[in-house]
Amino acid sequence: MKTFSAKPHEVNREWFVIDAAGKVLGRLAAEIAHRLRGKHKPIYTPHVDTGDFIVVINVDKMRVTGNKAESKMYYRHSGYPGGIYETSFAKMHARFPGRPLEKAVKGMLPKGPLGYAMLKKLKIYAGAAHPHAAQQPRQLEVRA
């Protein structure tokens, strides 16, 4: 019996909606990364994007445990000497509610063209409304 290998044109992608209200950042990101990669499917193939589309709503109500809201820092660099910037989770979440989740999921996906294609299937919205009703997404319950 030969090992099955999924072909890109044979993959059937579904749309799911996840409500992030009250969910913990890291646990939610791990489940989303798992679904974006397609590891929940029996046809999973490492070199083929077999994942589903994920729409995350209410990310403005997402939380972190402990005192990470103040102590968790995000760093970026301008490229100039001394040009390092740091932002706490609380500040970033207040200004850009979806960015902490996006950065967490991005860190859990493969680096390279395949990982970037997987990340494009993630849609993040701060409120409860989203423009993907035409895709008829199913509700996905995540224990996070």
Curated annotation (Swiss-Prot):
Xref: Gene3D superfamilies = Ribosomal protein L13
Q: Does the keyword Transmembrane apply?
A: no
Superkingdom per UniProt: Bacteria
Question: Gene Ontology cellular component?
Answer: cytosolic large ribosomal subunit
Q: Name one GO biological process term.
A: negative regulation of translation
Q: Give UniProt keywords alphabetically.
A: Ribonucleoprotein, Ribosomal protein
- Pfam families, per this entry? Ribosomal_L13 (PF00572)
GO molecular function list: mRNA binding; structural constituent of ribosome
Q: Tell me its family.
A: Belongs to the universal ribosomal protein uL13 family.
Function noted in UniProt: This protein is one of the early assembly proteins of the 50S ribosomal subunit, although it is not seen to bind rRNA by itself. It is important during the early stages of 50S assembly.
NCBIfam families named among the record's database cross-references? rplM_bact
How it assembles, according to the record, is: Part of the 50S ribosomal subunit.
Q: What is this protein called?
A: Large ribosomal subunit protein uL13
Provenance organism: Nitrosospira multiformis (strain ATCC 25196 / NCIMB 11849 / C 71)
Q: Which gene encodes it?
A: rplM
